C-alpha cells in the first residue's frame, strides 16, 4: 500500500471551540445551509456520532463525485481535534484504499485559532494519487472552511 500525505494550516478570527463545533460536530446540518452545492444529504449508517460512527454522504452537484462513506476515527472535544476516514465511494477513484483526515483547532492568544489539517491517502498497491487530486482535496477543505468561517462571523 502506498501512502501520500498533505498538510495545510490556516488561521481564523473565530475561536477554536466555535469552529470545531461547526466544522466537526454540526457539519451535517450546517454545510447544506452555507454551501448548498457541496452535500445533498448525509445519513448515519452506524453509531451515534461518536468514534466508530459510519455515515453515507451524498455529494452535491458542485462535486464531480456522488458518494462517500465516512468513519469517525477520533473526537476530542477538549483539545478540539477530530479525525475521520473516507472508506468507500467513487471519491476513492478505484485506486485509493482510504483517505484519513485529521484536524486540530489550536486556540490563539487573540481569541481566534489556527486550524491544522493532515490528509493521508492510502493507495492500493503502488498507485500514486495525482497532484491535481491532492490539490482538489485541499481546495475542497479550504472552500468548506471559508464558507463556514464566513457564516460564523456573520451570525
From Swiss-Prot:
One GO cellular component assignment for this chain's record is: cytoplasm
- Give me any GO biological process, just one: defense response
Q: State the PANTHER family in the record.
A: OS08G0374000 PROTEIN-RELATED (PTHR31213), STRESS-INDUCED PROTEIN SAM22 (PTHR31213:SF55)
Q: Which organism is it from?
A: Daucus carota subsp. sativus
Quote the SMART domains the UniProt record gives. Bet_v_1 (SM01037)
Q: Write down the InterPro entries for this protein, in alphabetical order.
A: Bet_v_I/MLP (IPR000916), Bet_v_I_allergen (IPR024949), Plant_def-hormone_signal (IPR050279), START-like_dom_sf (IPR023393)
Which GO terms fall under molecular function for this chain's record? Answer: abscisic acid binding; protein phosphatase inhibitor activity; signaling receptor activity
- Does this UniProt record's set of keywords contain Hydrolase? no
Tissue specificity as recorded in UniProt: Expressed in roots (at protein level). Expressed in roots.
Q: Which domain of life is it from?
A: Eukaryota
Does the UniProt entry include the keyword Iron-sulfur?
no
Assembly and oligomerization: Monomer.
Keywords, comma-separated and alphabetical = Allergen, Pathogenesis-related protein, Plant defense
Q: Which PROSITE patterns match?
A: PATHOGENESIS_BETVI
The record's section on CDD domains has:
Bet_v1-like (cd07816)
Describe the temperature dependence: Melting temperature is 65.3 degrees Celsius. Unfolds at 95 degrees Celsius. Partial refolding after cooling back to 25 degrees Celsius.
Family, according to the entry, reads as follows:
Belongs to the BetVI family.
Under what name is this protein listed?
Dau c 1 isoallergen Dau c 1.0401
Q: Which residues form a coiled coil?
A: none
Amino acid at each position: 500500500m502506498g501512502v501520500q500525505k498533505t498538510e495545510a494550516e490556516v488561521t481564523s478570527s473565530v475561536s477554536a471551540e466555535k469552529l470545531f463545533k461547526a466544522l466537526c460536530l454540526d457539519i451535517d446540518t450546517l454545510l447544506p445551509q452555507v454551501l448548498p452545492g457541496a452535500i445533498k444529504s448525509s445519513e448515519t449508517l452506524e453509531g451515534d456520532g461518536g468514534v466508530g460512527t459510519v455515515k453515507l454522504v451524498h455529494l452535491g452537484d458542485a462535486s464531480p463525485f456522488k458518494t462517500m462513506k465516512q468513519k469517525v476515527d477520533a473526537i476530542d472535544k477538549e483539545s478540539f481535534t477530530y479525525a475521520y476516514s473516507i472508506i468507500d465511494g467513487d471519491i476513492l477513484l478505484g485506486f485509493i484504499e482510504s483517505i484519513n483526515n485529521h484536524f486540530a483547532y489550536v486556540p490563539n492568544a487573540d481569541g481566534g485559532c489556527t486550524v491544522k489539517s493532515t490528509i493521508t491517502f492510502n493507495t492500493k498497491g503502488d498507485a500514486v494519487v495525482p497532484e491535481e487530486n491532492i490539490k482538489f482535496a485541499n481546495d475542497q477543505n479550504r472552500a468548506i472552511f471559508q464558507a463556514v468561517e464566513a457564516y460564523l462571523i456573520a451570525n
